[in-house]
Amino acid sequence: MFRVLNDDVYSPAEIQQQNPLAFGKASSLFTDNRSANDQCETGENVRESGQDHVKRPMNAFIVWSRERRRKVALENPKMQNSEISKQLGYEWKRLTDAEKRPFFEEAQRLLAVHRDKYPGYKYRPRRKTKRQQKLLPADSSKLCKQMHIETLQPFIYRDGCANTTGSRMESQLSLSQSVTITNSFFQNEHHRSWTNLGHNRVTLATQISADFPFYQSLQPGLSCAYFQY
């Protein structure tokens, strides 16, 4: 017992003989350490691959805006980065050539240093990962084209045939015309029926008034009120 407590280094076989549970814990620690070492190695590789990327030399505007951006950010802490960039672009355009000359000279010096440090440098923009491309919204140009086509769809004709929207409009127009013709037909028939009925009533009254002496001779006590219309 005293030997086990004082020994700092011991083999896994001795641990298994003394306590099987302790051996299981020790083996898990060994595997965890290996995985951690693997992660550290891969992390270093990722960093090394990121360090291989060479940045482009700064131009005159970047040289000027580097210090100016800090001042604007300190003066307006609530201003967004996009608004700061707009303001810097506006201020840069307002500068005269004499005011821009020192920054162009500094940019030329940085370009010469960059060429000496990286003689075979070529600008290679980073490719966007597939995940970022999936997260991005649809292309605005495609959406605008689709909206433009949908707007002009009723006026598009292909191979001498009208589009479906045009055919629908024509069918609705023909349907409305048929309904209008049907309504006018019923109105004319209704008017004719009322005209014929009124004409028949006038004819009946005329015939009764003409035959009134005959009915009066047949029935002497019959009053004229029975034949009033």
UniProtKB/Swiss-Prot annotation:
UniProt keyword Acetylation present: yes
Membrane as UniProt keyword: no
InterPro entries: HMG_box_dom (IPR009071), HMG_box_dom_sf (IPR036910), SRY (IPR017253), SRY-related_HMG-box_TF-like (IPR050140)
GO CC terms: cytoplasm; nuclear speck; nucleus
Pfam family, one: HMG_box
Intracellular or extracellular location(s): Nucleus speckle; Cytoplasm; Nucleus
UniProt-recorded Gene Ontology molecular function terms: calmodulin binding; DNA-binding transcription activator activity, RNA polymerase II-specific; RNA polymerase II cis-regulatory region sequence-specific DNA binding
Main location: nucleus
Alphabetic keyword roster: Acetylation, Activator, Calmodulin-binding, Cytoplasm, Differentiation, DNA-binding, Nucleus, Repressor, Sexual differentiation, Transcription, Transcription regulation
Post-translational modification: Acetylation of Lys-130 contributes to its nuclear localization and enhances its interaction with KPNB1. Deacetylated by HDAC3.
GO process terms (BP): cell differentiation; male sex determination; sex differentiation
DNA-binding region: 54-122
Signal peptide: none
Family: Belongs to the SRY family.
Subunit structure: Interacts with CALM, EP300, HDAC3, KPNB1, ZNF208 isoform KRAB-O, PARP1, SLC9A3R2 and WT1. The interaction with EP300 modulates its DNA-binding activity. The interaction with KPNB1 is sensitive to dissociation by Ran in the GTP-bound form. Interaction with PARP1 impaired its DNA-binding activity.
Role this protein plays: Transcriptional regulator that controls a genetic switch in male development. It is necessary and sufficient for initiating male sex determination by directing the development of supporting cell precursors (pre-Sertoli cells) as Sertoli rather than granulosa cells. Involved in different aspects of gene regulation including promoter activation or repression. Binds to the DNA consensus sequence 5'-[AT]AACAA[AT]-3'. SRY HMG box recognizes DNA by partial intercalation in the minor groove and promotes DNA bending. Also involved in pre-mRNA splicing.
Protein name: Sex-determining region Y protein
Gene: SRY
